[in-house]
Amino acid sequence: TAADSGKIFFINIASGMTLTLPSIADGVALDGWNCKVVIETNVSSNTFTITEGANDTDVIVAHTTENQSTASGGAPAGTSTGCTNVILANGADVVGDRFDIVCSGTKMYVNAMVDDDAAVTVS
């Protein structure tokens, strides 16, 4: 909700969950809204998903910063200029992976900082 701005959420759910962001389309003033999400328990089944509000369409702009890359040296999959979901895959996360989220009033900017380049995807 809009009241959650500035909070830090620690995720301790091994079975995964979905975090729904406040909806920009609902008309609530969200300019400057922000939060941080920190993974404290590995997601061992399902996924951890950050999703936009129900009335929004492709308002998430996602970027991934990774600590390591595979031998093939591929780019992180978790980068998008407009998407609905940012997904942290089960088994690819590391305790301490985090997401910084800030709203401009028209977009939700999600910066994922993860250990593994295969950990984050967007859709």
Which sequence ranges carry the predicted segments?
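Sequence/structural signature of small/polar-enriched beta-strand/turn repeats
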Residues: I39-T41, A92-V95
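Surface-exposed intrinsically disordered loops and tails
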Residues: E66-T84
